């Protein structure tokens, strides 16, 4: 499949999701969220793989194969979590961080912590909040049947990932990825 086909499919899925959100959303917050975070914990956007390895204690390294990721176990918002760090395939720059909590009951706590950092979601549905920034950065908070996941993606680096023909992330070990839930991929 060539990159134009992949781009067309991703664009179609994004539009479909956003149209679905628009039909079910609460009124959108007028103000753009505060500045997009520079990273999560000790990892900052654009860091090289070896820099993240040096800053974060990881338990799994899949940076030589898709989805080009490092995995760590740590506390986020004083809750145990699995943190997945995703890198662009060629330049190996950090462009996305997923934080997964293995307890759907912590959704309110995580949402409350994020609310202290952000002005509010652009789209809101039951168990899903989406914040967008002008540079196409995005934060998605999602409650899944067995987990809660927060996905932070840097807009400029998402673009770089696409330019480097990076694959969309299909799964985040050890739980289903947020993108699979959003796009309802089996």
Regions found by a protein language model. Give the residues of each.
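Short beta-strand element of the conserved SAM-dependent methyltransferase core
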Residues: 69-73, 84-85, 131-133, 141
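Mid-chain, structured segments of secreted extracytoplasmic proteins
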Residues: 72-110
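Bacterial N-terminal signal peptides that target proteins for export
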Residues: 1-10
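Non-cytosolic coordination micro-motifs
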Residues: 26-64, 98-186
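C-terminal motif of bacterial Sec signal peptides marking the signal peptidase cleavage site
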Residues: 18-20
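N-terminal, post-signal-peptide region of Sec/Tat-exported proteins
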Residues: 54-82
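Bacterial signal peptide processing site
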Residues: 22-24
């Amino acid at each position: 499949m060539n990159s134009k086909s992949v781009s067309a499919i991703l664009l179609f899925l994004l539009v479909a999701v956003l149209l679905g959100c628009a039909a079910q959303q609460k009124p959108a917050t007028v103000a753009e969220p505060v500045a997009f975070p520079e990273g999560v914990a000790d990892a900052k956007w654009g860091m090289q793989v070896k820099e993240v390895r040096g800053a974060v204690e990881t338990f799994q390294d899949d940076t030589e194969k898709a989805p080009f990721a490092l995995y760590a176990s740590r506390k986020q918002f004083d809750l145990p979590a699995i943190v997945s760090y995703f890198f662009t395939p060629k330049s190996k720059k950090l462009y996305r961080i997923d934080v997964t909590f293995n307890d759907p009951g912590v959704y309110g706590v995580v949402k409350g912590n994020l609310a202290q950092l952000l002005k509010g979601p652009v789209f809101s549905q039951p168990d899903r909040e989406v914040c967008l920034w002008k540079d196409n950065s995005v934060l998605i908070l999602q409650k899944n049947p067995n987990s809660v996941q927060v996905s932070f993606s840097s807009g400029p680096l998402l673009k770089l990932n696409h330019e480097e023909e990076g694959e969309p992330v299909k799964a985040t070990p050890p739980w289903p990825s947020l993108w699979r839930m959003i796009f309802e991929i089996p």
